[in-house]
């Protein structure tokens, strides 16, 4: 993995230069943390612990890719379609006043509001061709998780006939600016050139589909790839023009805690 200081002092400024040069509006830069155990990692035990602590998240295990995702990429039941993208993050605090202040600072942050707006506008644009009606909450709401607060906006719509299947919707929406960037093609190239890690299945769509084309898919974040005695953990941040490198590094540390705290209990 790349050292935190190099990630903060070299990679973030490199991407911010590209943003300032108008090459791209937003890029999601990820970090990798590798844990090594002295025996095979017990996936079932980890899933149980994730379930206990993350009641509102989708708990998943796909052949050793495990996690507790709070972010709904898209669901489709009949003609009804729903998404709940998350972009914009603040760290949670044990002390109530500090935690309330963190929430309020997130709501007041112009940087986080812009990062969120980029994601919502992109998602509405991509969903619109499939829908006869689509709507989004006028303002983002706070989603509070055990280690972080997020800005989230619920998007709902009615599919045009013949209704697209969940897999068609997933294909159209992945990867969103919440895990890649905007514009998508340019952001993905920058990630490939600069990020310097193998994301494996991190941030990929995870979910289920039935024979009628209904289903529900989350974004594969707050996740780890288990390979024998090793666990590869991932956390990403959305970089925009106003991003501050140390704050972004702190944000990855908070996001790692979902999985890291679970592994450290073993």
Regions found by a protein language model. Name each.
Residues 23-27, 32, 36-49, 53, ...:
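Extreme N-terminus nucleophile/cap motif
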Residues 78, 92-98, 242-247:
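A short, polar/proline- and glycine-enriched secondary-structure boundary/capping micro-motif
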Residues 66, 78-87, 133-136, 214-220, ...:
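Short, well-ordered strand-loop elements centered on a beta-strand within folded domains, enriched
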Residues 36-82:
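SIR2/sirtuin-family catalytic core signature
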Residues 1-13, 17, 32-36, 82-84, ...:
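Contiguous alpha-helical scaffold segments within structured protein domains
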Residues 26-27, 56-59, 80-81, 117, ...:
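Structural motif
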Residues 69-72, 154-266:
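Conserved hydrophobic core element of enzyme catalytic domains
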Residues 21-30, 60-62, 119-121:
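ATP-grasp fold ATP-binding core
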